[in-house]
């Protein structure tokens, strides 16, 4: 098993030194879901939310969050993102919306945290925009789905 990388030999928190790493293309995809009442999902999909186009605002929030990850997660490196893609998949049969975020860069460290932060903020934005009609919404299942690049190479969540 690997060791934790964000602690020194004394157990103090550190920012990992990436100076000796090569710049490589790095891609990470994360996903998560928000469960809601069927009526809430219907309002979102029908464009009937009082605050506007919920998914358009959540998409912009996700992109903005990926760019601000280092400001939110203390030991993350600021990363120059080259691409961010945000997708939403409504699942009416289970009354939820699945959000997937893919982040890319060419750099010395991965973009897993950026993708995970993007998903989290997108789902929080949906909650914020719809809480007036459904305070019982549940956010969950947030996880890394795939990462590529760097020393550890390619990893994919098992099916």
Curated annotation (Swiss-Prot):
It catalyses: (8S)-3',8-cyclo-7,8-dihydroguanosine 5'-triphosphate = cyclic pyranopterin phosphate + diphosphate. Its EC number is 4.6.1.17. It is an enzyme of class 4 (lyase). Keywords: Lyase, Molybdenum cofactor biosynthesis. InterPro entries: MoaC, MoaC_bact/euk, MoaC_sf, MoCo_biosynth_MoaA/MoaC, Mopterin_CF_biosynth-C_dom. One of its GO terms (biological process) is Mo-molybdopterin cofactor biosynthetic process. Substrate binds at residues 75-77, 113-114. The active site is at 128. GO terms for molecular function: cyclic pyranopterin monophosphate synthase activity. It comes from the Bacteria. Pathway: Cofactor biosynthesis; molybdopterin biosynthesis. Catalyzes the conversion of (8S)-3',8-cyclo-7,8-dihydroguanosine 5'-triphosphate to cyclic pyranopterin monophosphate (cPMP). Belongs to the MoaC family. Homohexamer; trimer of dimers. This is Cyclic pyranopterin monophosphate synthase. The gene is moaC.
